[in-house]
């Protein structure tokens, strides 16, 4: 009869297999060890960790749960909390993280997971409490905690310490933890944005730049998960029907869509392919089978993207467009569809993608002049004073920063009968804005929050605004187009990176360069001038209603699509 293998020998063999990356063999050793040592919680923990690395969270949960039944530890509770976060079971994740913190009140990893779960549920007060505590206990060294805290502070318009924390995060640029979207929303430094994007890209990709023969009829694919009530859909929904079907075969590869929007798009393309229910590897193989010449990714780095579907075999040329205003930092994209306002040629060094310029604004719109709609609404219906000048901003709260809100408050202080009309994003941001205003001597009645409503109702009420006030670091994009289409002037401050120059691009395209400013002082002066000079304000509004060439071109989707196709033909040839 052979002697029982010692636990230490099993542990040595497990560690050897792990050091060589042999996860399957390590798991076999663990399973063999558990036959002899079925009550050893560390074996289950090691097994759970390996399954988690392999992406098998079902077995990971099974092993961690077994370990917990043998010995209750903060680490296992936290590991289970992470699994429930991945499954979006945030209430369960919160419960497990709280148990871990009861064992160790200074356990920062559990505090982070608790904050992350609360943030995902929109419980920003609890999220801020625990993310702040995690940062403090960690001496602000872990960029994961910093990233979460800044995101929460942005969403709640709590700017007390945000500049200082942002400077600390700048020291971690390049560690691959900060998401590029957070970077472009907190700083307009293209250099910083680019470093963050490049460090976020984990795949080692080298594109084959050899010339490849295109199909006689160009096969053009779009990858998109936004055919639903989403800004991308609202902008691009009417483009597809204008593609030249005699020279193009247009394919849509869609995930996360609503039936009505799917049906509308499907009627205007060669083939609509639903990849929602298949994993990235299978979706990638599916796309490869269509032998695409060009693939345009409409999501890139935004929430719910499927960037991992794209690889070297997806298409002969791959383009980034519309969804993400900046460089992806990935070499998988050959081009970014852009314009000379949002990305001057001097900024090419901060992009992995080559610039593919549209002649006017890069941003497509649905071609509809909203202000022509006849539906009647009035200020009283929306809690707005009848005799008033309404200064609106319907951007999400994360786009508002302290410098811009102070500017808006100064404008209210220096003008009469003006009211600030903002989107009610969340209760905490609303209360924080009220608090900032009151400390500056502004009656809170002069700041009016509008609830979220369906798009049609929103556009009807938007026409009641006199001036749209743009945000600074991250402009309005779809919201700026909405204002233009409702004949509401937009005052913007042109920044240094893509996201802070989009409104300038749109205003230039509609012939309203005079609404583009270059510093906060000029921005403030222009808004005050418009509020006090009704003749000038009416003149600007009329420019958005008249039949001039700028507006004809802006709303001419057929022309926009032709110009897009000209760029695609350049690539093909």
Model-found features: residue ranges?
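Short, well-ordered beta-strand segments
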Residues: 219-221, 392, 421, 491
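Nucleotide-sugar-dependent
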Residues: 302, 470-480, 493-501
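Conserved donor-binding/catalytic loop of nucleotide-activated donor transferases
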Residues: 463-465, 482-494, 510
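Acidic, glycine-centered active-site loop in nucleotide-sugar glycosyltransferases
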Residues: 487, 502-514
